[in-house]
Design a protein with these regions (language model features):
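Helix-loop-helix hairpins in multi-pass membrane proteins, especially solute transporters
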Residues: 69-208, 225
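Cytoplasmic loop-to-transmembrane helix junctions
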Residues: 53, 138-145, 396-403
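Helix-loop junctions on the cytosolic side of multi-pass membrane transporters
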Residues: 186-206, 253-262, 429, 494-503
Length: 507
């Protein structure tokens, strides 16, 4: 018997092509969350900025994307799911082109914000559209396709970013979106019009949205600029901190009292949701901070090319792809708190392994923690998502999922900023301590006896001290993140035991 599709115009080859276009669009957006990670040293070198400033290229995209996630439902209801999807694709493609043309950090960050704002709605809308064009009995396969692109994107991102940066230039990590974006836009306009949703006049919480942008923007600016401006010795950093704190409090009060809040914070009344999202945010912040820091350390200290840094970073992909379906099945049969706790503590152990990395570590010594991390990530991500969405009422699932994704993305941006800032700050402290304890004359004499000139010895010593200081600082960051993972793994036990493990929705 032939399966009836929701839309007669979308069946057979056209349905498969439409699904491919939607999945490819999601893949392109997800890819851009990690493709720039290994290219940061190339970008900072080309634009003559510090590594801390270079990280803004990653965090600006993540923050802009996070801000747009809560607006997706309103945009789709007001203008139509397909229209918003196509408009987002067009904007994402245009801003990708502009990112490639950028010749200053300010321009690049500005265009990355535009890219994130346009790309933010594409991920949830791609999920919605796949569910919409496939019949009910094919929804599992549709979500499998969506999940595959969501998982594969971050794995291929570092590899593609490294290959492109080494063999072409960093500009091409953005230019490669052009042909993909144009094809997806044209195909979506041709195929998806029939799947358009009805539009209704919806009120938007403009005050809440403004407050959200205000406190998030102030917080991220404080984290990104704090290092350069000597933190709270700077008036501007104090102003940003006060703006973020006051803005957050006013935002909470407003959202709790508004009839149509941009973010439904009332779902935090469910203890299971509040605790699981806290653990998820802590875990993802430490995870994303690590994967932003590692490629930079490899290239700065171990003389890895961007390509090889990408290969090493991507070794975690095998475990993630292998374990995701297994963990999804285990989550229906076992207490997800135990699975999540196991995953988070395993991530803590893996990150602790990195805290003992040295400048003479070989590829496999560096790759093993990455491989083990790949196996651990599904254990914390899938069960925590299930606990969170299984703790709220049926009618609250959509807003809870949006809020969870928003906080996860924000935690990633904050984690990346903290990682690079602490790394840079502690490197200066470590260097100062090493220099004060270094017997320079003895080292110089040893180098002179080995044929080095007097002029070159100081440069060699300085370079060695810098490398060791940067590595010690990276070890310090990994130790802090290991503690965060373990703390999150213990906190999850404060969640009430799920009443029906098998009945919880997966995400």
């Amino acid at each position: 018997m032939k399966t009836q599709t929701p839309f007669a115009e979308l069946s057979g080859g056209r349905l498969i092509l439409a699904a491919f276009v939607i999945a490819l669009s999601n893949f392109m957006v997800v890819l851009d969350t990690t493709i720039a990670n290994v290219s940061v040293p190339h970008i900072t070198g080309n634009l003559a900025v510090s590594s801390t400033q270079g990280t803004w290229v990653v965090t600006s995209y993540a923050v802009a994307e996070a801000i747009c996630v809560p607006l997706t439902g309103w945009l789709a209801g007001r203008f139509g799911t397909v229209r918003v999807f196509i408009f987002g694709l067009i904007g994402f493609t245009i801003f990708s082109f502009l990112c490639g043309l950028a010749n200053s950090l300010g321009m690049l960050v500005f265009f990355r914000i535009g890219q994130g704002l346009c790309g933010g709605p594409l991920m949830p809308l791609s999920q919605t559209l796949l569910m919409r064009i496939f019949p009910q009995e094919k929804h599992a396969q549709a979500m499998g396709l969506w999940a595959m692109t969501t998982v594969v994107g971050p794995i291929l991102g570092p590899i593609l970013g490294g290959l492109i940066s080494d063999n072409l230039s960093w500009h091409w990590i953005f230019f490669i979106n052009l042909p993909v974006g144009i094809i997806c836009v044209l195909a979506a306009m041709r195929l998806l019009r029939v799947a358009e949703t009805e539009t209704i006049s919806l009120r938007i919480d403009t005050v809440g949205l403004g407050l959200l942008i205000l406190w998030i923007g102030a917080l991220q600016l404080m984290l990104d600029l704090g290092h350069e401006r000597d933190w709270f010795n700077s008036t501007s950093i104090i102003v940003l901190a006060l703006t973020a704190a006051i803005g957050f409090v006013v935002f909470l009060i407003w959202e709790l009292t508004d009839k149509h809040p941009v973010v439904d914070v009332k779902v935090f009344r469910h203890r299971g949701f509040a605790i699981s999202v806290l653990a998820l945010s802590l875990g993802f912040g430490a995870f994303f901070g690590s994967i932003v820091l590692i490629p930079q350390w490899l290239q700065m200290n171990l003389s890895y090319t961007a390509t090889w840094a990408g290969y090493l970073t991507a070794t975690m992909g095998f475990g993630s792809l292998t374990m995701s379906p297994i963990v999804a099945k285990l989550s229906t049969k076992h207490d997800p708190r135990a699975l999540a706790s196991f995953g988070l503590i395993l991530l803590g152990a893996v990150t602790l392994m990195r805290a003992f990395w040295t400048t003479d570590a070989d590829f496999m010594a560096l790759a093993w923690p990455q491989i083990l991390q790949g196996f651990a990530v599904p254990f914390f991500f899938i069960p925590l998502s299930n606990i969170a969405l299984g703790s709220v009422l049926q009618q609250e699932i959509a807003s809870a999922a949006g809020l969870m994704n928003f906080l996860r993305t924000m935690a990633g941006a904050i984690g990346a900023s903290i990682a690079v800032t602490v790394w840079d700050d502690h490197a200066k402290v470590a260097r100062s301590e090493m220099v004060s304890n270094l017997h320079t004359i003895e080292v110089q004499n040893t180098l002179l006896q080995n044929g080095f000139t007097a002029d070159s010895t100081l440069g060699i010593i300085s370079n060695l001290v810098d490398k060791e200081a940067i590595t010690m600082s990276a070890n310090h960051v990994f130790l802090l993140f290991a503690m965060v993972f373990v703390f999150a793994g213990l906190v999850i036990w404060l969640c009430p035991k799920p009443k029906q493990v098998s009945g919880m929705p997966s995400h």
